[in-house]
Design a protein with these regions (language model features):
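Active-site phosphate/pyrophosphate- and oxyanion-stabilizing loops and adjacent acidic/basic residues
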Residues: 8, 96, 119
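Active-site phosphate-binding/coordination module
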Residues: 1-39
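Structural motif
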Residues: 20-21, 45-49, 73, 135
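Short, well-ordered secondary-structure micro-motifs
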Residues: 32, 59, 83-87, 120-122
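Conserved Lys-Pro-Asp/Glu-containing loop-to-beta segment of HAD-superfamily phosphomonoesterases
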Residues: 11, 15-19, 102, 106-138
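A short, gly/pro- and small-residue-rich
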Residues: 32-33, 56-78
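Short, well-ordered secondary-structure micro-motifs within conserved domains or adaptor modules
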Residues: 40-57
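Histidine/lysine/aspartate-rich catalytic loop segments that bind and position anionic ligands
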Residues: 70-101
Length: 138
């Protein structure tokens, strides 16, 4: 859901802004389908999302753009993604690595339990904030 929340945020609050996306092909496809402009050169915003296809080149570009002061948004803060036989590093791990390299935390983090995500869910299902409970995997 965090990818949908991030896309919704961009469309409502950053229309027309270009994005450098750190994300796997599924996430990239979602952003393209939503009409988000993706670029490898001089983006307005860097989005760091779930990426099982991470490369050093992607990471290096993201760190350089973030160090230059580009707006930096993470799709969610989870450090690990649970698997049947353990876990794999998730976006929160990328956030820690990027902070070690650039000294910056994300300007905005989506996903649970952040307010924009709660509002997105309550608006989609038509209920009040106090009627919703989120269950996480961390």
């Amino acid at each position: 859901i965090s990818s949908h929340v991030t896309i919704d945020f961009l469309k409502r609050n950053r229309p027309g802004k270009s994005v450098y996306l750190v994300g796997n092909s599924n996430l990239t496809g979602d952003f393209i389908k939503a009409g988000i402009t993706l670029t490898d050169e001089n983006p307005d915003i860097v989005i760091v999302g779930f990426d099982t296809e991470m490369t050093y080149e992607k990471l290096n570009k993201a760190c350089n753009f973030i160090a230059q002061g580009k707006e930096y948004i993470a799709t969610h803060p989870d450090v690990n993604c649970p698997l049947k036989d353990g876990f794999m590093p998730d976006v929160g791990s990328f956030i820690a690595l990027i902070k070690a390299s650039t000294g910056r935390e994300p300007d905005l983090v989506m996903g649970k339990p952040y307010a924009y995500t709660v509002d997105y869910v309550t608006n989609r299902i038509g209920c009040k904030r106090e009627e919703v409970a989120f269950v996480g995997n961390e």
